[in-house]
Amino acid sequence: MDVKSTEYLQFVKVKWPGKKTYDIEVLNKDGSLTLGYIKWWGPWWTYTFHTISNIVLDPKCLNTITSYINQLMEERKQ
């Protein structure tokens, strides 16, 4: 399992059968709560964050998610 941990979040890569790109499950630090998923959004040609309803994120968490998406986009260019 491919997991990246940051100060407040965990990112877990999930590969679904028949799907070209993988999704990333975004969890709280201890992994007990799914906050949402980062998924490839074809119409925009980028990864996007899809929240689970009623999730509240502070600017640090939002910046961490944005940084992770930027990293995914850089990997995609290689």
Curated annotation (Swiss-Prot):
This is Uncharacterized 9.3 kDa protein. It comes from Acholeplasma phage L2 (Bacteriophage L2).
